[in-house]
From Swiss-Prot:
Name of the protein this chain belongs to: Transcription antitermination protein NusB
Keyword terms: RNA-binding, Transcription, Transcription antitermination, Transcription regulation
GO BP terms: DNA-templated transcription termination; transcription antitermination
Family membership: Belongs to the NusB family.
InterPro entries: NusB-like_sf, NusB_fam, NusB_RsmB_TIM44
GO cellular component: cytosol
NCBIfam families: nusB
Superkingdom of the source species: Bacteria
Function noted in UniProt: Involved in transcription antitermination. Required for transcription of ribosomal RNA (rRNA) genes. Binds specifically to the boxA antiterminator sequence of the ribosomal RNA (rrn) operons.
Molecular function terms from GO: RNA binding
Source organism of this protein record: Rhizobium etli (strain CIAT 652)
Length: 160
């Protein structure tokens, strides 16, 4: 008998979830630090995705999915932000939101628009769970409400 643990392969869904989380972190870093998309994608792919940092091992992430979200949000931000702003309550401006919440919403809305192969429920659930990883209060509810409103506008399956 061997004492070594056998590594189970990470399921594709888990790799996509890890890619979504990494994309939100990268978008946050770009928003706060002013880092460019090429630099941030290279940094994450070389030093973060599936790597050990400060004793914590990051889940293996689908690098293509990560790249698609980050570059897609940057490319389509002028289309994403008005949709998000319209889905917020009247007294809230997108600029008033926490940078992390903005990153979560932008990534989620990008997937709703661009990844028609992924069910709405999967996208909304994944990004609400990401919000729950960062916030205990009302932010996950806000993410859920905004993504749900936008999904009903842009996806026929969510209109039911």
């Amino acid at each position: 008998m061997s004492d070594e643990k056998t590594e189970r392969p990470v399921k594709t869904a888990n790799q996509r979830g890890a890619a979504r989380l990494a994309a939100v972190q990268a978008l946050y870093q770009m928003d706060v630090g002013g880092t460019g998309v090429l630099e941030i994608v290279a940094e994450y792919e070389a030093h973060r995705l599936g790597q050990e940092i400060d004793g914590a091992t990051y889940l293996k992430a689908d690098a293509g999915w990560f790249r698609s979200i980050v570059s897609g949000v940057v490319r389509d931000q002028v289309r994403l932000d008005p949709l998000i702003a319209a889905a917020l309550q009247d007294d809230w401006a997108l600029s008033r939101l926490d940078s992390t919440v903005r990153a979560i919403l932008r990534a989620g809305v990008f997937e709703l628009l661009d990844r028609k192969d992924v069910p709405v429920a999967v996208i909304v659930t994944e990004y609400v769970e990401i919000a729950q990883a960062f916030f205990d209060d009302d932010e996950p509810k806000l993410v859920n409400a905004v993504l749900d409103r936008i999904a009903k506008q842009v996806r026929s399956e969510a209109k039911k």
